[in-house]
Design a protein with these regions (language model features):
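P-loop/Walker-type NTP enzyme "switch/lid" segment
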Residues: 1-29, 84, 136-138
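C-terminal alpha-helix
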Residues: 158-167
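Charged catalytic carboxylate motif
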Residues: 19, 72, 155
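Short, polar/flexible loop-turn hinges at active-site or ligand-entry regions and domain interfaces
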Residues: 7-10, 60, 145-147
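Conserved catalytic-core segment of NTP-binding enzymes
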Residues: 23, 28-128
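C-terminal boundary of histidine-terminating zinc-finger modules
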Residues: 136-155
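Short, glycine-rich, amphipathic interfacial segments at transmembrane boundaries or analogous
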Residues: 129-136
Length: 167
């Protein structure tokens, strides 16, 4: 919600594309990782986040729209890299909100893994669709706090380990 409010205000801010980078500048060295969770759009907050980022972990929903949106994101990232942030890289692709029913999600997952193998890292960890994630968000807490012993929480912990181990 906070990012949505910021998105409405960013165009009015002088130098809006560098505003997040400027904001994070003084605190960047205090953290190993700073996560900026953007909405699935290519609006001004997402672009400003790309300008501020060192690398991007890209969640991909294994369905047509999720796959189709990747090309637009990669094109936007290429423009940001050329003009505003030469060091921007892809940390990896994360298959997320994976449905356990039907063959289509598994087929899309295979497509994603095959299409980007050798191009970008596709994390081994897959995050399954779970009601606990939106419920945790609605309660303003992490999924770890909200649903400590649930499968989806264990998947997020596995992703964390995978990111930390592979840097």
């Amino acid at each position: 919600r906070e990012l949505a409010a910021v998105e409405m205000q960013l165009p009015q801010i002088q130098g809006s594309l560098t505003s997040i980078k400027k904001f994070l500048g003084p605190i960047r060295d205090q953290y190993d990782y700073i996560l900026i969770d953007c909405m699935p759009s290519l609006g001004s907050v997402t672009i400003a986040s790309l300008v501020a980022a060192g690398s991007v972990l890209i969640p991909v929903v294994p369905e047509w729209l999720g796959i189709d949106g990747l090309q637009a994101l990669f094109e936007t990232m290429a423009q940001v890299r050329r003009k505003l942030n030469r060091s921007l890289s892809v940390e990896g692709l994360l298959i997320t909100r994976m449905s356990s029913s039907g063959a289509a999600p598994k087929e899309y997952e295979r497509e994603i893994r095959n299409a980007y193998k050798g191009v970008y890292r596709v994390f081994d960890t897959t995050i399954m669709s779970s009601i606990y994630v939106p419920n945790a968000c609605a309660h303003g807490v992490s999924v770890l706090t909200y649903a400590r012993n649930r499968k989806v929480t264990k998947q997020y912990l596995a992703l964390t380990q995978e990111v930390l181990q592979n840097g």
